[in-house]
A protein has these predicted regions:
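Substrate-binding/catalytic cleft of secreted carbohydrate-active enzymes
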Residues: 1-176, 192, 201
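Exposed aromatic-hydrophobic patches
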Residues: 204
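Short proline/glycine-enriched turn/loop motifs at strand-loop junctions of beta-rich domains
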Residues: 179-185
Length: 204
């Protein structure tokens, strides 16, 4: 690449450690933290290690988590042995919320990428669909995580979105309401009473 045009920076995506990551001018990490290894909270630890030991690299990051809108209920972050069959939308939503929280505190990364905007067909998946997109395979239904990035990245159109509206069955008397807003602090009311809100991350 350098022989063809020395003026253009080279870039690569890596899920490995080691000297391999020193080859290109730019590196985009695809470590899948909180997806196929560890928990999303471990992203904060990894970013700290990146700053202390690899800060000479020009680093970006890409990430994603599967979520099927037909699967609602337990949004638990810990992955199960049958996770290819059980991919609740709520778990994908929380995954992206956590990444938003930790990446907002970081100044080292030069770029952020979501793995894919749309779900796509895959013979490797039991349902025949790779569901890491923010929009369904038919391009008609937007998942909650789509609205998160619209609130974060769309500066021309204000966003106000309540998550979890497809969760028809809920357990317990205490419920959490999550709102994405780029239109100012939302006001949440219940039976005429205004509820206290707490910011979890930018726009959340």
């Amino acid at each position: 690449a350098k022989k063809m045009d020395r003026s253009r920076p080279t870039a690569a995506t890596s899920n490995q450690d080691g000297e391999l990551n020193q080859i290109t001018d730019l590196i985009v990490w695809a470590q899948n933290i909180g997806w196929d290894k560890g928990r999303t909270e471990d992203l904060e630890i990894w970013l700290g290690q990146l700053r202390s030991g690899w800060n000479q690299l020009r680093s970006g990051i890409c990430y994603g988590e599967a979520g099927q809108i037909e699967q609602q209920g337990d949004p638990a972050r810990r992955r199960r042995s049958n996770s290819l069959l059980w991919q609740p939308e709520g778990r994908q939503t929380r995954f992206h919320e956590d990444y938003t929280k930790y990446l907002a505190q970081d100044t080292l990364l030069w770029g952020t990428w979501i793995n894919t905007l749309f779900d796509y067909g895959s013979a490797r998946r039991p349902q025949g669909v790779e569901a890491t997109g923010l929009v369904t395979l038919d391009r008609r239904r937007r998942k909650d995580a789509f609205h998160l990035y619209k609130a974060l990245w769309n500066n021309t159109e204000p966003t106000l979105h309540i998550t979890g509206r497809r969760e028809d069955e809920r357990n317990g008397d205490l419920q959490t309401v999550t709102v994405y807003s780029s239109a100012g602090e939302p006001v949440v009311t219940l039976s005429g009473d205004t509820l206290a809100v707490e910011q979890y991350a930018p726009c959340i």
